[in-house]
Structures are given as structure tokens and as C-alpha cells.
From Swiss-Prot:
Mg(2+) 2 binds at residues 319, 321. HAMAP family: Dala_Dala_lig (MF_00047). The lineage of its organism: Bacteria, Pseudomonadati, Chlorobiota, Chlorobiia, Chlorobiales. Its cofactor is Mg(2+); Mn(2+). GO terms for biological process: cell wall organization; peptidoglycan biosynthetic process; regulation of cell shape. Disulfide bonds: none annotated. The keyword rRNA-binding does not apply. It holds the Pfam family Dala_Dala_lig_C. This is D-alanine--D-alanine ligase.
Amino acid sequence: MSKTTIALLFGGKSTEHEISIISARSISGAIDRERYRVVPVYITHEGAWFSGDSAAEILSLDLSSIMRKSSVGNTETLLREMIRNSAEKPFDFNFRAAGIDVVFIALHGSYGEDGRVQGLLDTMGIPYTGCGVSASAIAMDKALTKLCAADAGVATAPSITLDADSYLADPEPVHELVDSTFGYPLFVKPASLGSSVGISKVHLPAALPEALKVACSYDRKILVEAAVSGKEIEVAVLGNDRPVASVPGEVEPGSDFYDFQDKYIHNTAKTFIPARLPDKLLDSVRCSAITVYKALGCRGMSRVDFFVNEENGSIVLNEINTIPGFTDISMYPKLFEASGIPFTALIDKLLHYAQEKPEAAGR
């Protein structure tokens, strides 16, 4: 039987560049090499594409360990140095000429999870894992996601959306608006970033200007959101027209909230699979995850995160990730492992869904 050739796309022009490499390394290790041939395709911070020895060398790095011992800035320097020392030159990757059958997108954040790469692949007629252009673009924007979820009957946290340029030009009216609209603590978030990059939990009005300034440095669209009490619950969803939801998992942050440092550097958060909730509430969370998935028109995969209050039974959407992490601490593969789908089988299913006809999958 001939092998299916996969282009494993990782790196990218995103603040989540290093996390993408760690995810791709895990995915590469889980792919069934009896059935699939893997072609690593690395995208640099500047957007140059490499495939060959340099891409394979970067993919082999234990970047997770390196990040825990060093800073993200140092890992970025290391990656740039490896490319500079490589004899290879960047190129415009021709998927068809390379005999690629399907692309596994392991890019996180901007220029990978937001519909841009998906549109490029659609134009070339190359199948790929995960959501299509529209679902990817909507899910990347937290404000648009909230609108779609609310329209589908899923609760979201009260929030206001701000324009970064307008705020920086005249900040005081925004401070007054936030103070009159919300109590403290509250969250300030870039609208279109993942891995909790640029997010601040603000406990006092005096800390609001700095939190807004940080968010504005990452995005032109900012979300100010009320803090919601409850457990942080994550649900993995898999499939196209008939998606299935995993057993829900629970994250207990090791810091004030589940931020980038807690996720990838200090690794102090505790996880519980299944989540410590009554069965009836677990079922309701799974149903809500499917509702959000369908409302956004997702396909292939997503991880849907909620805040669940066990006392009053409220389920509030936090966010949806259309290319969830695949690192060794990531919940998406862990949740399906606990639901009876091992990592290698999960990768196989994702590649299968990627190659379904677009009209059948609703792309």
C-alpha cells in the first residue's frame, strides 16, 4: 500500500512560534510511519519557508525543555541562528510538485490559525487539517466568537471591544467607560491571540492603563471582559458534519490565571480528567461545546473552553481554539486519550477528516 504524503507545517509569523514547534514535534512522533510519509515544512519568524535538513533539525529540538531553562527570546535567537547557519535557502513551497497529499497545520496564532494559510491551501486545492477559512477567522477573533456563541444560545462573559489606536490617542474616556461598566477584577485581552499572550488580569483601576497598553502592543482590537467565577473546563471536539465531544477536563491554574508562563514555562497548573463536576453538568458542557463548534462552522478539530459554576450550574464560554496545542502538556490529545482515542489514532482521524470532500465537510 502506498503511503500518504503529509506536509507538517509549523513555526510561523506568530508570538506562538515556539509552541507550534513543540506541537509539531509531538505530532510527528505520533504519526503512523507505516501509513504516512512526513515532509516537515518550517516557516521562520519572518515568513520564509524551509523544507529539508534545517526543518527536520528544528523539528527534532526538545524546545519545551529549552524554554523551561531559558527565555522565549533566547529560543528565538537559537532558531534564527540555526537558519543562518544552514546552507539551505528559503523557497516558495510547491505542494503539488512535492507530491503532498494533505497538510497537517500545526501553526498557532496569527498567520496560521486565523484563516490565512487555510485560504492559501484552498486556492491550491490542497486538503488540510482543521477548520476552513471562515471558521478559523471568526474563532481567532474573541469578540466575533462571542457574538456567534450568543446567537446560538451559549452564554459569554460581559465585555466591551476597543480600538487600540483610538484608545492610545485618548485613553481617559476609555478608563472612565471601563470603571463605570465593570467591577474588579477584570480581564484585558488582545482580541486575536492565543496561548494567553498579552492577557492581563486587572485587580485595581490603577493597573488598567498598563494592561491596556500591553494588549495594544499585540493587537489593534482589544477586549475588556468581566471576570467570571467558576472552574476552567476544556472540551476537545473532533469531526466534520457529525462532531463528537471528549470527556471534559478541568484546569486548576497555578497562578492568578492560566497564563503563558503557567502553561509552558513553569507548568504549575493542575489538570483533572474528567473534570470534577456532576455527570449532568459534564453532559451539558459537552453539548455546549458542540453547539459552539457548529455555530462557527468548525470542521476537523477545536478545543472549546468554558467557565462552569458548580453552585448555580452556569456555563460561560471562554474561547475556542481551532488549532489547539499538541504539546505533551496539551489538553486536546489528553482529553481524547481519556475518551478512548489514543494520540496516533487521533492524528489518523484528523488526516481522514481533512481529506473528506469539502461539500461533505461543510468547509
